[in-house]
Swiss-Prot record:
Tissue expression profile of the protein: Component of the acid-insoluble and acid-soluble organic matrix of the aragonitic skeleton (at protein level).
Keyword Secreted included in the entry's annotation: yes
Domain annotation CUB: ranges: 232-338
Positions of disulphide bridges: 232-257
Keywords: Disulfide bond, Secreted, Signal
PROSITE patterns reported in the protein's UniProt record: CUB
UniProt xrefs under Pfam families: CUB
Domain of life of the source: Eukaryota
Biased composition, class Low complexity, residue ranges: 154-229, 392-409
The name this protein goes by in its record: CUB domain-containing protein
Length: 409
């Protein structure tokens, strides 16, 4: 028994020694080790990195430049960019604060690392006058191409189909008349008379009636609904005059007009109100500086004389002969009436002027200033007329601007 167990133990030892080692002899570990060596070799020489950043060949981008996105889309063309890994398709829109214009552009752009270099380079070419700029870069062919809405095109196509349909029906009807007549008169042996009669009737009667009535009814119904737009507002430059719509006639209801001007440093603009006649408190003329309203004129909400008020014969003005302490250039007269609006004032007061009511001076600080006119639906009047002069800031304009108070009486 002892000898049998000894032989079995020796046999097991021989079997275990003959089994190959998993850590060294199995071929799978040799294969993975070879792949690890290849990966480290590629990383050392940058082969994998070069394959990931390989540029796209023949990148095609949409190219156009216009004041609006719609005009740019209408005029866009496809261009092939240079083969460069840093070139991308660009779309950007910028607003120039000095010229008050918008530029919309598409095309190839050498972006480098950041796409925002487009706004920086364009702002440098515009002397730093851009107030807003939006850019977008992409790296697939025609990824920056724009498209227009299909509503206008479908209407045009449907009208074209209707006109073509009417023309085809008239031609078919004339062809039927020419073929029907020879079939009925095919019994006689003479064929020359039949051909002459068919040609005369087909050319004289059919084409003159159907196309004319169809063409006159379709185009006359559509273009009668669009109202004429009211043109007002704009960009102010140099010197000139701007007025309310329809001046010296009454301005329309529910209208808003805005005039803007860009004021660089060491420049100023002077507004002088020549005439002012507003109907009610819902109608106003505002002057703003950098989005902040600095002066507002409204319709008569208080029984006080406005800058456009004309003196009547019943109003009394104190002169230097009656009161030596008053000066007409430094004081203004106020007349108060009762609820029935009698012409005779029941209360009269003379107060010293705080500022010139018809003159507004704004100093330049590289900002946007201007005026806004608004009217409601309660009524209308003659409106206003304002003169403006833009130029270099002097001591007189600075002194007049500093003497003006911020609130209106």
């Amino acid at each position: 028994m002892f000898l049998f167990s000894l032989t079995v133990l020796s046999a097991l030892v021989l079997i275990t020694e003959s089994i190959p080692s998993v850590a060294t002899d199995f071929p799978f570990f040799e294969i993975t080790k070879k792949f690890d060596d290849i990966e480290t070799y590629n990383n050392d020489y940058g082969i994998l990195k070069f394959q990931e950043q390989e540029p796209m060949e023949n990148l095609t981008c949409a190219s156009c430049e216009a004041p609006s996105e719609r005009e740019c889309t209408l005029n866009q063309t496809a261009v092939v960019c240079d083969q460069d890994p840093n070139i991308a398709c660009l779309t950007f829109e910028a607003f120039n604060n000095f010229t008050m214009t918008t530029t919309f552009r598409r095309g190839c752009f050498l972006s480098g690392i950041l796409c925002e270099n487009a706004c920086r380079s364009f702002n440098a070419s515009q002397d730093g006058n851009l107030t807003s700029c939006v850019q977008d870069c992409c790296n697939s062919s025609l990824c920056n191409a724009g498209s227009l809405p299909t509503e206008v095109t479908t209407e045009a196509s449907t009208t074209a189909q209707e006109t073509t349909a009417t023309s085809t029906t008239t031609k078919q009807s004339t062809g039927a008349s020419t073929t029907a007549e020879p079939s009925t008169t095919a019994a006689p042996s003479t064929t020359t008379k039949q051909t002459t009669v068919a040609s005369t009737t087909a050319t004289t009667t059919k084409p003159t009636t159907a196309p004319q009535t169809r063409a006159t009814t379709l185009p006359t119904t559509a273009p009668t609904t669009a109202p004429a737009p009211i043109a007002c507002g704009g960009v102010l430059r140099g010197r000139g005059t701007f007025t309310s719509p329809g001046f010296p006639g009454n301005y329309p209801n529910n209208v808003r007009c805005e005039w803007r001007v860009f004021l660089p440093r060491r420049q100023a603009i002077v507004f002088r109100i020549v005439s002012l006649d507003l109907a009610d408190p819902g109608d106003s003329l505002e002057f703003f500086d950098s989005g902040r309203v600095i002066r507002t004129f409204r319709g008569l909400s208080r029984r006080k004389r406005s800058p456009s008020h004309r003196q009547t014969t019943n109003e009394k003005v104190l002169g230097e002969g009656e009161d030596g302490y008053y000066d007409d250039q430094e004081y203004v007269d106020y007349y108060y009436y009762d609820g029935r609006r009698k012409r005779e004032p029941y209360f009269y007061q003379r107060r010293k002027k705080r500022r010139q009511q018809d003159r507004i001076v704004i100093q330049g600080r590289n900002q946007v200033a201007g005026a806004i006119f608004q009217s409601d639906a309660a009524g209308n009047a003659a409106g206003f007329s304002t003169q403006f002069v833009q130029g270099a800031a002097d001591s007189e304009s600075e002194a007049s601007a500093s003497s003006e108070s911020s609130d209106e009486d």
